Amino acid sequence: MNSRVFHEGYDVIVCGAGHAGCEAALAAARMGASTLLLTGNLDTIAQMSCNPAIGGQAKGQIVREIDALGGEMAINTDCTAIQFRLLNESKGLSVQSPRAQCDKKAYQFRLKHSLELQPNLLPFQATVTGLIFEGARVVGVRTNLDLEFRGRTVIVTTGTFLRGLMHIGQNKNEGGRLGDFSAKTLSASFLEAGIELQRLKTGTPPRLLGRSLDFTKMTEQKGDKEVTRFAFHDTRDVEPLFHVEQTGEQRLGWAADSNQISCWMTYTTERTAELVRANLHRSAMYSGEIEGIGPRYCPSIEDKFVRFADKPRHLLFLEPEGRSTNEYYVNGLSTSLPFEIQREMVHSVPGLENAVLLRPAYAVEYDFAPPTQLFPSLESKKVENLFFAGQINGTSGYEEAACQGLLAGVNAANKARGAAPLIIGRHEGYTGVLVDDLVTKGTTEPYRMFTSRAEHRLLFNHGSAEFRLAHHARTHGLLTPSRLARIEDKRTAVLKWVAFFENSRIEGGRGTWGDAIRRATTGNAAPVQYPSEFLILSQAIQEEVIYRISYAGYLAREERQIAKLAQIEKIKIPQYIDYKSVRGLRRESAIKLDIVKPQTLGQASRISGVNPSDISLLMIVISATRA
């Protein structure tokens, strides 16, 4: 045996311990797969490299879906949050999204502790430098310690570290995050295997010293009095998070009677705009130093003043990074300008005139693998047993990374034991939409999830994730029998009360309870006085019942549309079809179909540039292969 081979029997090896890697490792281990989690630094596991927050528009729903599939992000957020808010509370339930500010270090340490306690899982500090192949299969990894680890499957969750290059003005440093080294040699393994790589860019704002800020010149943004948590079940426990006498923090980290910490709002000024415009030539993004494309929906301050030149000012949020630190994150001030300009820019903002910068803003560009090279299971089409999740697939955000990591972990464990993969449909949740968009359409810029990307978003209210995904959790063994039983009890209660309200008339009133609820929802009637038996139910059950009744007509229409689309989704496309030889198929369509290699006719229909006549031709070809 090769003396460098440390272990030859892992089912799953995860490369990288960010938000995708942690969910991947936990999911695989919880399914019983022997799992190795490799990271360059055990002390930066699950680090919040950018803003110290989880959730938000569509992202909050994704976190709920992660919880419904047995993931950790929701629980970890509930246990380490310092502020909770429900976004879009004045709007309909379908677009309401939970969001939480987290204690950055507590989030990181609690998740590290959870990994350490998980059976079947070994977190190990080593940097992956290359992959080991046997033919068109991956069979292990090499590390900087001159050790090799062998495994049946490998998941790559390298974030921004693949040939990461940080920019502050004209200054460049190798690294995927300030203070951490980049993975310089791993990209060569992908290229060796024929996997295409491209470059993307992201950025982060400066961090400020809280005691140097003048909050009297800002607007306070408090947390909600009625807290909306992320996890569907009670997550409280009293195990010590830090095993030292000086701290009272528990693994819970938050309780109903504890004080939430406020965020603060302020605005840029004309002086801020002048500084940015006068120094654009010194910005790494505008001087030609950066090749990668940045995030459209999280633009740098340079982009804001260039792309939205008509706006006189831009909103900034001062977000606390934790209970045990005085550091603040300046949401909205991402930049790659030189440090001296950053400081002037910060001082031009009301309340920040005397701010002390603790860390500079910077941009980072990195390699990513265009995700059309993946199957919907997130396994590589070119290298068997190799899975990708997170920013390496071109996404942006902790939540987008985490849900991919969970799916990759489940599917790698399934592949190792010869089981079918977990595929979530577009009609089942934002996670399904995200993966389908990535593997079918690809992306040329950091992909962020929005409610508008989901055609069936009315079905994706944050409270319904358990009901939508429980059958997947049951099939793949992702939840305990007791929790699955609780979900079924909740489902039974919801269906019972929906039926009661729709079929029972209000004594002395007009129509049924359901009619009254719909009138109240549209503002055309006074609030409904619900029966006491209904009001003693959990808030989650009450909200789901009211939602289903309020939007009954719309939800029924969505279900009919899904039923129609289901027929085309069921038609499998043989993977041996040579699209270029299909007579009548346009050349553009043939090229795109050959790149994506869709698994179903439904997936083929969503490829950009493939039109209905192309789908009709494919139906004929598929029918002929079956004859």
Predicted regions and their residues:
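Extended, charge-enriched "interface" segments that sit outside catalytic cores
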Residues: R453, L459-N461, A465, A470-R626
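Glycine-/small-residue-rich beta->alpha transition segments that form the dinucleotide
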Residues: T153, T158-L162, L337, P350
